[in-house]
């Protein structure tokens, strides 16, 4: 009888832990020359990474997405040497959001002709 209670408790705790919708996830976007969803929200007199991240944050917040943090790094293997708007610059934007906002974020990339999307 004691072992049944123990296993029941373990199962209940396991279910409670696995169903946590407040978990955070990180989504990525390969920055383009001028085809990023938030480009209209970036108004910079002087360019800084913090100001650029703030523009991204402002855009996502206006779309109803809670942002935990934003970071970016250069991945030289993703650089596309062309001048078109859809060409990737090599900068990968990482956006940490609550798991429940993942679907909203993926919808923002929409159906674009270049196949750009959050991953």
Show which residues each predicted segment covers:
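C-terminal motif of bacterial Sec signal peptides marking the signal peptidase cleavage site
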Residues: 15-18
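Bacterial N-terminal signal peptides that target proteins for export
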Residues: 1-7
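Immediate post-signal-peptide N-terminus of mature secreted/exported proteins
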Residues: 24-35
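Short, compact, well-ordered microdomains
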Residues: 83-119
């Amino acid at each position: 009888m004691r072992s049944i209670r123990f296993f029941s408790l373990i199962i209940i705790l396991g279910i409670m832990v696995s169903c946590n919708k407040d978990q955070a996830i990180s989504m990525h976007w390969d920055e383009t020359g001028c085809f990023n969803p938030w480009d209209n929200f970036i108004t910079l007199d002087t360019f800084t990474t913090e100001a650029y991240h703030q523009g991204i944050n402002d855009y996502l917040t206006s779309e109803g997405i809670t942002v935990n943090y934003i970071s970016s790094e250069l991945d030289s293997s993703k650089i596309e040497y062309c001048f078109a708007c859809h060409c990737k610059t090599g900068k990968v934007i990482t956006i940490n959001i609550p798991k429940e906002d993942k679907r909203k974020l993926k919808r923002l990339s929409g159906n674009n002709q270049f196949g750009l999307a959050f991953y």
